[in-house]
Amino acid sequence: MYNARELAMFRMQAEADALGADGIVGARLEIQQNEGYGDLLDFVAVGTVVRARENGTAWRTPAGRTFTSDLSGQDFWKLRKAGYVPVQFVHQSFRQMLRQQGQNVELPNFTQATYDAREIAMARMQAEAERAQAIGVVGVRVTESTRVWGQHAVEFLCLGTSVRRVEENEHVIASPMVINLDAT
C-alpha cells in the first residue's frame, strides 16, 4: 500500500518538475477499490502546480524537489507570507487486527488497539515529516475506521502537510486578505 501511494505521489511530482513548477498545492490522494479486482487498490494523486515569480529555490524542498501540499492555494499563500513553505504531503496509517469477541461489554483489547493505532499512525507521520527535514505538520486530519477482513480491524489514517521555516526577516501579513465583493 505504501509503495503504491509513493509511486502515485512520485509520478505527480515528476509531472510538476517537467512543467518547471516549484510545488503542488491542493494535492489529494484518492484511493479507489474497483469491483472485480479483489483487494487491489488504485491510488490517484492530483493537485495544482505553482511556480514562484522570483527565484523559486526557497519554495522547493531541501533536497531540491518539488514540494507537495494538501493545503488550498489560499492556505499556502498565508503559510508562505508567515515565513513557512510546505515540504511534503505526509500520509500514514496503521491497522490493528483483533480477534472477534461475542460479549456485550467494553472490549478492553479493542479500546487499547484503538489508542495504539492512533499513536502509531501519528508517530509515523511525524517521522515522515522529520525525514523530509520539516519542523512540523499543519492541516492534520485524522480519520478512524473499523473494518472486517476476516478479522475485526481498526485503522487510523493521518494526513497533513509538513512545513519548514524560510527567511526569518520576511514580511509577515499584518491583516487577513480581504476581497471586496461589492466591486464591479
Predicted segments, located by residue:
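Short, conserved loop-to-beta-strand elements that form functional interface hotspots
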Residues: 23-35, 136-148, 170-177
